[in-house]
Amino acid sequence: MLSPVALAAGDFLTWRIRLPDSGSSSPPCEKGEKRMEQYTTQMDAARRGIVTKELEIVAKKERMTVEELMPLVAEGKVAICANKHHTCIDPEGVGSMLRTKINVNLGVSRDCKDYDVEMEKVMAAVSMGAHAIMDLSSHGNTIPFRRKLTAECPAMIGTVPIYDSVIHYQRDLATLTAKDFIDVVRLHAEDGVDFVTLHCGITRKTIEQIRTHKRKMNIVSRGGSLVFAWMCMTGNENPFYEHYDEVLDILREYDVTI
């Protein structure tokens, strides 16, 4: 069989996916939180000269010394995405001088809402070497699935909190408040996700530019479109921009990477 990197997307259609059995080599999930009394985040630890368990694991995987990796983490050139609540994670580093990492997007939608199927996708992705799982669920009760991911999946887990905001509160977009959006970010952090996509860049000034300057295309980002629509409906500033410091405090508390 050819190496996956030598194949085109269509070549995978005939592949049969082998799901991991009970003898999987993935590390077992441990109960409880990782100890972080001396530092808040992996970056903070690196800046303090503290060698974390995650740093040691990543250095070994990347065939680097701790002394080579630590300054890269301290300077923000490498991120070790490892939420302190995701205790079964098999840590990976992302960034400068490291191996390329594979991310797999999945999640339920209105048209496909079977969480068991999504978990099968997760197992298949991990068994084939995926380093990260991005949960893009946009329908139904997402909490049990997200918590199952962080309880059982050793890969990094990412989410897009804005996708979850409307379905979490089950209210019209225009009725949500800035606090509602920020609270969902906290919920995802508490649930153990390792990284999040936040649409902080669009501002009231940006909206005026969009209205007065013709674009070749409409906004193509789903999350960006939701933020844009909410701002137009309410006349308010982007909550992720206006309350950015509060968002950073939340992410720092749980060690979540943006």
Model-derived features: positions:
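Short, Lys/Arg-enriched N-terminal segments with co-localized hydrophobic residues
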Residues: 14-35
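Often metal-dependent polyanion-binding catalytic scaffolds in large enzymes
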Residues: 38
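Alpha/beta enzyme core
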Residues: 41, 45, 52-53, 57-257
